[in-house]
Amino acid sequence: VDSTETFTQRAFLPPFANYQLDIAYDEMFTPEGQPRPNYQYLHQLLLELPATELRQRQHAADITFLNQGITFTVYGGSDGTERIFPYDLLPRIITSDEWATIEKGLTQRIIALNLFLKDIYHEAHILNDKIVPKALVYSCRYFRREMMGLRVPNDIYVSIAGIDLIRLSDGQFVVLEDNLRVPSGVSYMLANRQVMKHVFPRLFSRYDIRPIDHYGQALLATLRSLAPPNCTDPTIALLTPGVFNSAYFEHTFLARQMGIELVEGRDLLIHNNIVYMRTTGGLKRVDVIYRRIDDDFVDPLAFRPDSTLGVAGLLNAYRCGNVSLANAIGTGIADDKALYAYVPAIIRYYLKEDPILQNVETYLLTDKSQRNYVLEHLGELVVKAVGESGGYGMLIGPHSTQEQREQFRKRILVEPRNYIAQPTLSFSRAPCFLDGQVEPRHVDLRPYILYGKQVTIVPGGLTRVALRRGSLVVNSSQGGGSKDTWILYD
């Protein structure tokens, strides 16, 4: 009996009538069509519950998101408006053993990337030893010469990271992308959990799930650890671009969770290289800034002169050691998509260890032979712009038109440094409740890593879902959604 027949006999009853297995790893089912142990209760519950009840719960979740203002902004759309962040009712369930590997691998990776940043802005041993090409680092638009020789608190450049993982068909998690500048989405992870507890308490109480509610306090402790020398009780502020930013909900959410001030650039001023915040009681010194603004915009005197989002003189205050920034300026070189290809070598160089989490095979288009191969196989590969995020600047070969491939061919030939290519991967699919049916959709996972006095990884992360059938793009700006991620206790 083939796996499809077995699957049909045992599990293909409504609401699974449209559920089909393929070569991708399925989070709920084995290749033979059996529910995996961690999904057995959820599978049974879905067989028992009427579709009307599931629809009611999904509607209740949507209303909760709307009432709480849990939205994001899509730029450039026809409406250009705020939308509810699409939420799928069915949780993603990860075993404790799987999580233990993820946690170790992410800890190893964030430590190595911080050592790399410290090195390239000081002695540059890794460049002189030709492990990473100098040209790659110095040509990166996120490499900041202003950071050369500057010490940062505890030598930690990246205090807050979101690292994107996918699960391949063999069941292994691999790293797809490092987000080390201004990672976003953690508020949706926290909101998803609260909504799930509210709309599906029976399911939630049946599983032994590790909590994530302490993220806000863990983030606050991380920011406090960055206080300048001799500052025992730092004043911390979250610097937001303002209400029109797509992640503004997250900025307000996190500031509230931590009990810190939410400020815009116009609320801050610099005097004698010290940062002050305007308050109703007068000026108050600020010691640590959690910035949700990219390097280019933080200081119009140092970077983009047209920026109205930052604070004039902030870089000088930072260089004088009077204020700490999370993340440090210049971390973007470490999440450049071309530099990504060297992270396994970076881990081996600094830690003398093999990577616990593997990379995806990556073609560097500055290499002539690799470039020629990619140009001949554009219809099979994924091409990414090295400095873009959010699913922009990307060509998914199998889903592209001849015209799109020609556009990318021209761009690559003009600026090969600005692009990388990777195989089109069949990453895992998880069950989603869509239009009264349970169907599989591709998912990734973004765990959030904090690096203060130690590395802290809240057990879970944001599982993003490509809600369009067949789509591999999980970004909310491109029609993706999210679901609650459960890490089980042993």
Q: PLM features: residue spans?
A:
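Preference for protein termini
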Residues: 1-490
